[in-house]
A protein has these predicted regions:
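Conserved tyrosine-mediated DNA breakage-rejoining catalytic core shared by Y-recombinases
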Residues: 101, 155, 164-222
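C-terminal catalytic core of tyrosine-transesterase DNA break-rejoin enzymes
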Residues: 150, 154, 160-161, 273-297
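Short, polar N-cap/turn motifs at the start of nucleic acid-interacting alpha helices
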Residues: 168-179, 265-268, 285-307, 334
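C-terminal secondary-structure termini that scaffold catalytic or DNA-interacting sites
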Residues: 1, 174, 180-187, 226-229, ...
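Short, aromatic/basic-rich helix-turn unit that serves as a nucleic-acid recognition element
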Residues: 2-30, 68
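N-terminal DNA-binding recognition helix of tyrosine site-specific recombinases/integrases
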Residues: 32, 40, 45, 64-101, ...
């Protein structure tokens, strides 16, 4: 028996027990669907139908108040995609339809990601980081932070995966790095010429074997001791409060606090924002790739489907355009500006 969108939404909401505000938003989407007047069952819902509905939502919103029709259409798109992804997981539909791109819209919320010029500024400002009291490590603290910025950008890691600040954190250790082309996970068919990195998400404890691209490879090599202890953490210099040092780094880079548009409140950037930055640039590069790379469960898609997304994640990681500053090391310009060759003095 064909499944209507109304039935699918009701089952989807019952499965997740969302907040009342979320339920109301989905009800609004269903009212728009009813006013559109097309009763296509979800089994037959395709990209062409979805585009037609979203175009109607956009035009309807523009005709009613004209405030921000793109945002309205994109909100409806996110609801449809979440329901269809859940229906796919439940085997209610044979395949997840491709969705049209999001529509241009006026940003009404604060920006929660860092731009590439800001990442460049952070990277170069790390040369100004002062030596912490009692620092006796072989490399400057700035060198560790430059490598950390690179892995935050490329993998969207949790802070506790880079620097262990709590007893339950599992940081990346020297034994978690493999320089082989073949992944330590033998189920992974792809081969990486730059090696592999293992880590585990704090929230879900899910293990990941990720390929290193050229930029990550160069920065991991740059902080790896000649005779590494397999149990030693790779990244040092976070201290007991990495976010405090990150705020200092933002100050050195001349990056002001972000602004909450609703309240006007100034809020400092935190390391979690680098995770949001990672998701932003991955989805810009390869749409939907951040779901797998960050280890999210989006729209009810569970990990049993992620095996099919592994090639997508591999391609996204290996081809992600990097901030220009990140290329300085791999091009042989470590410690100097790649454009003017001005040398930086590490603290």
């Amino acid at each position: 028996m064909p499944t209507t969108l109304e039935t699918a939404v009701a089952k989807y909401l019952r499965s997740g027990n969302p907040a009342q505000r979320t339920r109301e938003e989905y009800s609004t989407t269903l009212r728009k669907w009813a006013r559109w007047g097309n009763t296509i069952p979800i089994e037959n819902l395709g990209r062409k139908d979805i585009r037609a509905f979203l175009d109607w939502v956009y035009e309807d919103a523009a005709g009613r108040d004209g405030g921000n029709p793109g945002r309205t259409a994109n909100k409806v798109r996110s609801h449809l995609r979440a329901v269809m992804a859940w229906a796919w997981e439940q085997d209610m539909v044979g395949a997840l339809p491709r969705f049209p791109k999001v529509k241009p819209h006026r940003v009404v919320a604060g920006r929660h990601y860092l731009t590439k010029p800001e990442l460049n500024a952070l990277y170069f400002a790390s040369h100004q980081m002062t030596r912490p009291r009692g620092w006796s490590e072989p490399f400057s603290v700035g060198r560790y932070w430059r490598s950390a910025l690179v892995v935050f950008f490329n993998y969207g890691l949790d802070t506790g995966t880079v620097w262990r600040t709590e007893t339950f954190h599992e940081p990346i250790r020297c034994r978690h790095v493999s320089w082989d082309r073949q992944s330590p996970d033998r189920e992974v068919k792809e081969q990486s010429p730059w090696g592999w990195l293992f880590y585990r998400r704090l929230k879900t404890h899910k293990a990941f074997y990720r390929p290193m691209n050229r930029t990550v490879h160069a920065h991991i090599k740059n902080i790896m001791p000649d005779d590494p202890d397999p149990e030693a953490p790779i990244f040092l210099g976070g201290g007991t409060r990495p976010n405090k040092r990150f705020r200092t780094l933002c100050g050195l880079a001349g990056i002001g606090p972000k602004t909450n548009i609703e309240t006007g409140e100034k809020q400092p950037w935190v390391l979690r924002d680098l995770r949001k930055t990672c998701a932003t640039y991955y989805d810009e590069h390869v749409p939907e790739s951040s779901v797998e790379i960050l280890g999210h469960s989006a729209g009810g898609v569970t990990y049993r489907h992620y095996a099919h997304r592994a090639p997508l994640a591999f391609r996204a990681i290996m081809t992600l355009p990097q901030p220009s500053a990140f290329a300085a090391l791999s091009k042989g310009f470590d410690g100097q500006c790649p454009c003017c060759r001005r040398r930086f003095a590490d603290g």
